[in-house]
Design a protein with these regions (language model features):
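Pocket-edge structural micro-motifs
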Residues: 25-27, 52, 74, 96, ...
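Glycine-rich, histidine-containing beta strand-loop boundary motifs that form or position
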Residues: 74-78, 85, 96, 116, ...
Length: 221
């Protein structure tokens, strides 16, 4: 395992300035942040947990952690079964659960733009109110959409409709350096540059943190 630096009080102060009132240390860190729903793969408490609220906050946090060589683990609802959100090196956990807004629908292009903390079930129900369907249907309905995309979740409908990968049009990602990158487009076809979008889908948080998604919808049957 790579060697990382310890989180110092000075680093905690810098993080608190970015996300005041939403940076937790010591006994204030929720025990759930030490694992996902399959603790058989191991548990470890992070040194710091942060409830992020925006792309800009996550960017600023990542810049500090990158400069100080602090390990970072991104976490959604923690419903996974493979230990992917377990902070095995300690460090900082960034939770995206407070980034839960359905930002907008584009009925001309049949897309919806959401933050990564929106739950799959919440989008499915809201889309139906618009006469639209978000087809991916993984087994865990209360997983976040950011987590679904990070794992390229499938489900029973995959045989007919495909997996999550087939419904991601665009995303905003914060790289480990803190750089903010926009990938993809809301339209159904674009040939501008490399398909970085498909590199991110299924990467399980190893390449960056997804902070916004534009997803494809279809007319509800």
């Amino acid at each position: 395992m790579a060697q990382y630096n310890q989180v110092t009080p000075e680093i905690v102060e810098k993080l608190q300035a970015i996300a005041p009132g939403r940076v937790y240390t010591g006994a204030d860190v929720n025990e759930d942040y030490s694992r996902d729903e399959m603790p058989i793969y191991g548990t470890r408490m992070p040194d710091v947990a942060i409830d992020a609220m925006s792309t800009e906050e996550i960017s600023a946090i990542m810049k500090i952690c990158n400069e100080n060589h602090i390990p970072v683990t991104c976490r959604g609802a923690g419903t996974g079964l493979a230990g992917a959100c377990t902070p095995i090196a300690g460090g900082v956990v960034i939770c995206t659960m407070k980034m839960k807004k359905i930002l907008s629908y584009d009925t001309d292009n049949f897309t919806v733009t959401v933050q990564p903390g929106v739950l799959l079930n919440d989008l499915a129900e809201d889309a139906l109110k618009q006469g639209l369907l978000y087809p991916p249907d993984p087994g865990e309905k209360f997983a976040t959409l950011g987590g679904n995309v990070s794992t390229n979740a499938g489900g029973m409908r995959a045989v007919k409709y495909g997996t999550t990968r087939d419904y991601v049009r665009a995303m905003t990602v914060v790289l480990p350096t803190g750089e903010i990158v926009n990938m993809g487009a809301s339209v159904s076809k674009t040939s501008s540059g490399y398909s970085l979008l498909n590199l991110m889908i299924g990467s399980e948080g190893t390449l960056g943190i997804i902070t916004e998604l534009t997803l494809k919808l279809i007319p509800a049957p």
